[in-house]
């Protein structure tokens, strides 16, 4: 219970920091925001907004907020093309070199057992929801920054959002396309109880 409360407080803190960041940018004239400051601003906005969805997703089944049909991969060939064209496999390799390279961290997603496939399915949904929600909100907030005249920050926001949130969505959908081949159609609805 304490962990859930703390993580919700972290998310609320990030909401307030996001609002403060946007208020700060509105008080700065576009020509005063340097290249480096624009990049830092874009990075912080992406980090804060992604965290708003990540922290609750660590302690609540946020993936269930979207309907089951959303998570079904209906056109795996198109997904494979997007995966290849965007070179998402390099993004995956970068993740494996970092945090997910440790066996302990990988086992959180999939432990190699048959029951682990259901857990993996659940984790892909959790991850995809967090990144997809952040992707959409950051996209919307970027137009506030654009309206303030911070065009360089606007461009950096989209670049970071694309790599930091769109790539993970594609990666999780790629994982789920493989899961769908392993699980009967209805079994992917029976997700582990995560509280």
Whereabouts are the PLM-identified features?
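Long, highly hydrophobic alpha-helical transmembrane signal-anchor segments
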Residues: 4-75, 130-132, 139-143, 148
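Membrane-proximal soluble regions of multi-pass membrane proteins
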Residues: 62-120, 178-181, 185-195
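Short, amphipathic, aromatic/basic-enriched membrane-interface segments that mark the entry/exit
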Residues: 120-131
